[in-house]
C-alpha cells in the first residue's frame, strides 16, 4: 500500500473478520502467521519473517524508542461461526486476542511515522505452553518498551500481573 493509504473502520473490521475466520488453535497458527506476513508486507513493514517456532516478527520505522507490540495468534480449540450483529463482531478469538493483535498491527503501520521503531510480533502457543514468547525471550530483542495485547479488563491499563516463579537455587559456600 502506498503511504497515502488511510486505514478506515471498514478496512479494520474486514481485516479482523478475515483473521477470525482462520482456525488457529495452539500449535496450528501457521495460517495466521502467513496472513499477518502478507498484511505486514502490504502495510510497509520490513524484515517480515516467521521464526523457527512459528512467531510472526516484523519491524517498521527506525531509531528510538524501540517498542515491542506483541499479541498471540492462537485460540482455545473449538470453532465458533463468525458473525456480525450491529456494531459487534463475534468469533473464536474476537477478544482473546485477535482483535488486540489486529489493532496493534494497524497502529504500528501508522504510529512509526512519529519516529522510532515498532517490532510487531504475533506469538504462538499462548493458550498452551507459551512456546512463542519463550522463543522470543531467547532472541534478546533490543527494546525500550513492550505492550502485550491481552484482554485484562476494560476500565484501565494493566501494568503487571501477579504471577509465580519457582526457583531451585543451590549455593556452594565452600568448606
Region locations from a protein language model:
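A generic beta-sheet turn/junction motif
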Residues: 60-62, 75, 162
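Solvent-exposed residues in well-ordered beta-strands and their adjoining turns
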Residues: 61, 170-174
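Active-site beta-loop-alpha junctions enriched in small/polar residues
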Residues: 25, 72-74, 125-127
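N-terminal helical capping/dimerization or prosegment-like subdomains
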Residues: 1-68
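Acidic/histidine-rich catalytic neighborhood of metal-dependent amide-processing enzymes
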Residues: 102-166, 170-171
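Residues at alpha-helix caps and immediate loop-helix transition turns in enzyme cores, especially N-
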Residues: 32, 81, 100, 132-133
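Active-site metal-coordination/substrate-binding segment of hydrolases
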Residues: 64-122
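Active-site/binding-pocket entry motifs
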Residues: 75-76, 153, 175
Amino acid at each position: 500500500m502506498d503511504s497515502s493509504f488511510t486505514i478506515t473502520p471498514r478496512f479494520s473490521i474486514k481485516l479482523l473478520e478475515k483473521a477470525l475466520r482462520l482456525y488457529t488453535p495452539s500449535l496450528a497458527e501457521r495460517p495466521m502467521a502467513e496472513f499477518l506476513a502478507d498484511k505486514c508486507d502490504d502495510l510497509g513493514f520490513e524484515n517480515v519473517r516467521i521464526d523457527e517456532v512459528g512467531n510472526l516478527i516484523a519491524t517498521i520505522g527506525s531509531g528510538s524508542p524501540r517498542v515491542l507490540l506483541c499479541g498471540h495468534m492462537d485460540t482455545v480449540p473449538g470453532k465458533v461461526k463468525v458473525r456480525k450483529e450491529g456494531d459487534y463482531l463475534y468469533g473464536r478469538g474476537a477478544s482473546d486476542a485477535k482483535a488486540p493483535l489486529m489493532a496493534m498491527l494497524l497502529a504500528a503501520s501508522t504510529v512509526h511515522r512519529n519516529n522510532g521503531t515498532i517490532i510487531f510480533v504475533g506469538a504462538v502457543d499462548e493458550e498452551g505452553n507459551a512456546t512463542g514468547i519463550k522463543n522470543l525471550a531467547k532472541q534478546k530483542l533490543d527494546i525500550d518498551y513492550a505492550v502485550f495485547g491481552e484482554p485484562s479488563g476494560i476500565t484501565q491499563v494493566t501494568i503487571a500481573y501477579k504471577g509465580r516463579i519457582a526457583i531451585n537455587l543451590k549455593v556452594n559456600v565452600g568448606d
